[in-house]
Amino acid sequence: MIPFELDNHELSYQQLIAHIQSFINSLTIDKSAIVAACINLSGRINTQTGYSYSYFHLHEIPLADSFTNDIGITTFIENDSRAMAYGEFFGGGYDASHALFLNMDYGLGLGMLLDGKMYYGKSGFSGEIGHVPMFQNEIICHCGKKGCLETEASGWALLRHFKEKIEQGVSSAVMRN
């Protein structure tokens, strides 16, 4: 595992490029044999245009094109939950024509395959279930809205709840030596 912190800054982008280049250089095949690469990121990804609306708004061109230029290999981008759904659907050995894949990580995402094809929805962003308004709370989500499902039921919400309980004096085995 290579330590890496995804952040919407030039340094994070350059570190990611360096990790990818290092990986490519470690391969025993010639770089020209690599047909394409796909980089999976969380958040809103438009696979048709190659834009990420969540990360690396650093250049005037689509993110997929930036990766292609900097890596030297045709690169596509995809939402992480949809990529996981693809992997599970095609690599999981299941005999099904439809699938749902729930990704509960730092945020919440859903990948949907219908008749073996990824479902993107009308806007191209289907599966962003973490931003469905569900709660009457004053917690501001990463998307800027209040009350999203992610504010109470996601990795970052669980961490926030844990920290609040510890600050209130609740004991936890996690805090023991």
Regions found by a protein language model. Give the residues of each.
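Glycine/GP-enriched mid-protein hinge/lid loop-to-helix segment characteristic of carbohydrate kinases
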Residues: D7-Q15, G72-N177
